[in-house]
Amino acid sequence: MRSMAKKGLEEVLETLDRIIHDETVPRNVRRVASEIKEKLTTTDEVSLEAASAISVLEDISADPNLPMHVRTMIWNLTSQLERISVE
């Protein structure tokens, strides 16, 4: 993996950690973030898992119970994952 993609992945994992440990985030969203993190860290096909994660994140960003700051974090995650899936 290229260094730019590796750095991008590290940023994604940090953001996922913040979502997972934020008590204001609904439990189902924290669970999904945890699953995405696990898939990204255990696969050899990071670009494929990044594309899959984008789809899931777009679905949960529409959750009406999601705090606005978390929705913004999810949109930023999606943007970062798009860069990883292309590389």
UniProtKB/Swiss-Prot annotation:
Superkingdom classification of source: Archaea
Family, similarity comment: Belongs to the UPF0147 family.
Name listed for the protein in its UniProt record: UPF0147 protein AF_2370.1
Origin species: Archaeoglobus fulgidus (strain ATCC 49558 / DSM 4304 / JCM 9628 / NBRC 100126 / VC-16)
